[in-house]
Amino acid sequence: MANYTKRMRDLREDRDINQGAIAKVLHTTQSQYSKYELGKRSLPIEHLITLCKLYDVSADYMLGFTDEPKRLPKK
């Protein structure tokens, strides 16, 4: 099972997005977001949902329960 903080960083870096840009989407600071990626602070569920939507991946993938990104179903 992969560490969700590594998945957060990998997904962000794969898309060439900096921490500040993600922090704005989450309505937080770059410093706070950095703490989420480093595992120094727990990621709120609201932020998890937002990141899954942003990256178009399932929560199972983000949390490391699966290695298949499983795109979210379109409504």
Positions of the model-derived regions?
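Conserved hydrophobic/aromatic packing and binding residues within compact polymer-binding modules
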Residues: M8, I22-A23, Y33-Y36, M62
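Short basic helix-loop element that most often maps to the first helix and adjoining turn
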Residues: K6-V25
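Short, charged recognition helix plus adjacent turn
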Residues: L63-K75
